[in-house]
Curated annotation (Swiss-Prot):
Its EC number is 3.5.4.16. The keyword Nucleotide-binding applies. One of its GO terms (biological process) is tetrahydrobiopterin biosynthetic process. Toroid-shaped homodecamer, composed of two pentamers of five dimers. It comes from Campylobacter jejuni subsp. jejuni serotype O:23/36 (strain 81-176). This is GTP cyclohydrolase 1. It comes from the Bacteria. It catalyses: GTP + H2O = 7,8-dihydroneopterin 3'-triphosphate + formate + H(+). InterPro entries: GTP-CH-I_C/QueF (IPR043133), GTP-CH-I_N (IPR043134), GTP_CycHdrlase_I (IPR001474), GTP_CycHdrlase_I_CS (IPR018234), GTP_CycHdrlase_I_dom (IPR020602).
Amino acid sequence: MQKKFEDCVKTMLEIIGENPNREGLIKTPNRVFKTYEFLTSGYTQNVKEILNDALFESSNNEMVLVRDIEFYSLCEHHLLPFFGRAHVAYIPNKKVVGLSKIPRLVEVFARRLQIQEQLTEQIAQALMENVDAKGVGVVIEARHMCVEMRGVQKANSTTTTSALRGIFLKNEKTREEFFSLINSAKQVRF
Protein backbone atom coordinates (compact mmCIF):
# COMPACT_ATOMS: atom_id res chain seq x y z
CA MET A 1 0.00 0.00 0.00
CA GLN A 2 2.82 2.42 0.86
CA LYS A 3 4.49 1.92 -2.54
CA LYS A 4 1.21 2.52 -4.36
CA PHE A 5 0.69 5.75 -2.38
CA GLU A 6 4.24 6.95 -3.06
CA ASP A 7 3.88 6.16 -6.77
CA CYS A 8 0.72 8.30 -6.86
CA VAL A 9 2.61 11.21 -5.27
CA LYS A 10 5.39 10.85 -7.87
CA THR A 11 2.78 10.87 -10.64
CA MET A 12 1.15 13.98 -9.17
CA LEU A 13 4.52 15.74 -9.08
CA GLU A 14 5.09 14.88 -12.73
CA ILE A 15 1.61 16.07 -13.73
CA ILE A 16 2.17 19.50 -12.18
CA GLY A 17 5.45 19.81 -14.08
CA GLU A 18 7.95 18.84 -11.39
CA ASN A 19 10.79 16.35 -11.49
CA PRO A 20 10.24 13.86 -8.65
CA ASN A 21 13.89 12.80 -8.94
CA ARG A 22 15.39 16.21 -8.18
CA GLU A 23 17.19 16.66 -4.86
CA GLY A 24 14.42 18.48 -2.97
CA LEU A 25 11.69 16.06 -4.06
CA ILE A 26 13.38 12.66 -4.04
CA LYS A 27 12.07 11.76 -0.55
CA THR A 28 8.82 13.72 -0.86
CA PRO A 29 6.60 10.71 -1.74
CA ASN A 30 7.73 8.94 1.44
CA ARG A 31 7.29 12.09 3.54
CA VAL A 32 3.79 12.63 2.15
CA PHE A 33 2.88 9.00 2.90
CA LYS A 34 4.05 9.32 6.52
CA THR A 35 2.24 12.65 6.89
CA TYR A 36 -1.07 11.26 5.64
CA GLU A 37 -0.63 8.10 7.68
CA PHE A 38 -0.43 10.31 10.79
CA LEU A 39 -3.14 12.77 9.75
CA THR A 40 -5.60 9.93 9.13
CA SER A 41 -4.63 7.75 12.12
CA GLY A 42 -8.11 8.24 13.61
CA TYR A 43 -9.42 5.45 11.39
CA THR A 44 -7.37 2.92 13.36
CA GLN A 45 -8.43 4.09 16.84
CA ASN A 46 -11.36 2.65 18.77
CA VAL A 47 -13.53 5.20 20.60
CA LYS A 48 -15.01 2.65 23.00
CA GLU A 49 -11.56 1.50 24.12
CA ILE A 50 -10.42 5.07 24.73
CA LEU A 51 -13.49 6.09 26.76
CA ASN A 52 -14.45 2.87 28.54
CA ASP A 53 -11.06 2.55 30.22
CA ALA A 54 -11.59 5.92 31.87
CA LEU A 55 -15.14 5.91 33.24
CA PHE A 56 -15.43 6.51 36.97
CA GLU A 57 -18.40 6.39 39.36
CA SER A 58 -19.37 9.88 40.51
CA SER A 59 -22.21 11.71 42.20
CA ASN A 60 -21.41 14.85 40.18
CA ASN A 61 -24.39 15.97 38.14
CA GLU A 62 -23.13 19.39 37.07
CA MET A 63 -21.70 20.40 33.72
CA VAL A 64 -18.15 19.38 32.86
CA LEU A 65 -16.60 21.55 30.14
CA VAL A 66 -13.25 21.10 28.43
CA ARG A 67 -12.72 24.13 26.22
CA ASP A 68 -10.14 25.34 23.74
CA ILE A 69 -9.12 21.87 22.60
CA GLU A 70 -6.87 22.64 19.66
CA PHE A 71 -7.17 20.30 16.68
CA TYR A 72 -6.40 20.04 13.01
CA SER A 73 -8.07 17.90 10.38
CA LEU A 74 -8.23 17.41 6.62
CA CYS A 75 -11.16 18.59 4.53
CA GLU A 76 -12.57 15.58 2.71
CA HIS A 77 -13.36 17.68 -0.36
CA HIS A 78 -9.90 19.15 -1.08
CA LEU A 79 -7.55 17.32 1.33
CA LEU A 80 -6.55 20.71 2.70
CA PRO A 81 -6.24 21.38 6.43
CA PHE A 82 -8.81 22.96 8.67
CA PHE A 83 -7.96 23.71 12.26
CA GLY A 84 -9.34 25.39 15.33
CA ARG A 85 -10.72 24.76 18.79
CA ALA A 86 -13.35 22.44 20.13
CA HIS A 87 -15.37 23.08 23.28
CA VAL A 88 -16.90 19.89 24.67
CA ALA A 89 -19.27 19.66 27.65
CA TYR A 90 -21.40 16.96 29.19
CA ILE A 91 -23.57 16.41 32.23
CA PRO A 92 -22.66 13.14 33.97
CA ASN A 93 -25.16 10.40 34.70
CA LYS A 94 -23.48 8.62 37.65
CA LYS A 95 -20.18 8.35 35.74
CA VAL A 96 -17.50 10.83 34.70
CA VAL A 97 -14.89 10.31 32.03
CA GLY A 98 -11.21 11.07 32.59
CA LEU A 99 -10.61 14.64 31.44
CA SER A 100 -7.75 13.73 29.11
CA LYS A 101 -10.08 11.41 27.19
CA ILE A 102 -12.18 14.29 25.86
CA PRO A 103 -9.30 15.82 23.86
CA ARG A 104 -8.38 12.26 22.76
CA LEU A 105 -11.93 11.82 21.48
CA VAL A 106 -11.63 15.06 19.49
CA GLU A 107 -8.33 13.80 18.02
CA VAL A 108 -9.77 10.43 16.98
CA PHE A 109 -12.39 12.08 14.78
CA ALA A 110 -10.22 15.02 13.67
CA ARG A 111 -7.59 12.63 12.32
CA ARG A 112 -9.88 11.46 9.55
CA LEU A 113 -11.01 13.05 6.31
CA GLN A 114 -13.78 15.31 7.55
CA ILE A 115 -16.14 18.18 7.19
CA GLN A 116 -16.55 20.34 10.27
CA GLU A 117 -20.27 19.69 10.60
CA GLN A 118 -19.71 15.93 10.70
CA LEU A 119 -16.76 16.24 13.10
CA THR A 120 -18.95 18.17 15.55
CA GLU A 121 -21.74 15.60 15.34
CA GLN A 122 -19.41 12.61 15.71
CA ILE A 123 -17.80 13.97 18.88
CA ALA A 124 -21.19 14.71 20.46
CA GLN A 125 -22.69 11.36 19.52
CA ALA A 126 -19.67 9.32 20.66
CA LEU A 127 -19.58 11.04 24.04
CA MET A 128 -23.34 10.69 24.51
CA GLU A 129 -23.37 6.98 23.63
CA ASN A 130 -20.20 5.86 25.37
CA VAL A 131 -20.48 7.86 28.60
CA ASP A 132 -24.27 7.61 28.96
CA ALA A 133 -24.36 11.33 29.74
CA LYS A 134 -27.54 13.24 30.53
CA GLY A 135 -26.53 15.58 27.75
CA VAL A 136 -23.65 16.72 25.57
CA GLY A 137 -22.76 20.02 23.92
CA VAL A 138 -20.00 20.51 21.35
CA VAL A 139 -18.98 23.75 19.64
CA ILE A 140 -16.19 23.89 17.09
CA GLU A 141 -14.63 27.08 15.73
CA ALA A 142 -12.28 26.54 12.80
CA ARG A 143 -10.43 28.08 9.89
CA HIS A 144 -10.51 26.23 6.58
CA MET A 145 -7.62 26.39 4.14
CA CYS A 146 -9.97 25.35 1.32
CA VAL A 147 -11.72 28.70 1.93
CA GLU A 148 -8.59 30.76 2.58
CA MET A 149 -6.12 29.38 0.01
CA ARG A 150 -8.42 28.67 -2.94
CA GLY A 151 -11.95 29.40 -4.06
CA VAL A 152 -13.20 32.57 -2.38
CA GLN A 153 -9.80 33.19 -0.70
CA LYS A 154 -11.23 34.74 2.46
CA ALA A 155 -8.39 34.79 4.95
CA ASN A 156 -9.12 34.53 8.66
CA SER A 157 -12.80 33.65 8.26
CA THR A 158 -14.05 31.33 10.98
CA THR A 159 -16.75 28.68 10.78
CA THR A 160 -18.67 27.76 13.94
CA THR A 161 -20.69 24.57 14.31
CA SER A 162 -22.55 23.09 17.25
CA ALA A 163 -24.11 19.78 18.20
CA LEU A 164 -26.39 19.39 21.21
CA ARG A 165 -27.71 16.18 22.72
CA GLY A 166 -30.03 15.32 25.61
CA ILE A 167 -30.53 18.03 28.23
CA PHE A 168 -28.41 20.50 26.22
CA LEU A 169 -30.97 20.30 23.46
CA LYS A 170 -34.09 20.13 25.64
CA ASN A 171 -33.28 22.58 28.42
CA GLU A 172 -32.75 26.24 27.52
CA LYS A 173 -30.97 27.08 30.80
CA THR A 174 -28.43 24.29 30.30
CA ARG A 175 -27.83 25.43 26.74
CA GLU A 176 -27.42 29.06 27.84
CA GLU A 177 -24.98 28.05 30.60
CA PHE A 178 -22.90 26.09 28.07
CA PHE A 179 -22.67 28.94 25.58
CA SER A 180 -22.05 31.46 28.37
CA LEU A 181 -19.15 29.41 29.78
CA ILE A 182 -17.56 29.17 26.35
CA ASN A 183 -17.90 32.90 25.70
CA SER A 184 -16.83 34.09 29.15
CA ALA A 185 -13.81 31.81 29.07
CA LYS A 186 -12.47 33.65 26.02
CA GLN A 187 -11.63 36.62 28.19
CA VAL A 188 -9.85 34.62 30.90
CA ARG A 189 -6.35 33.34 30.24
CA PHE A 190 -3.96 31.81 32.75
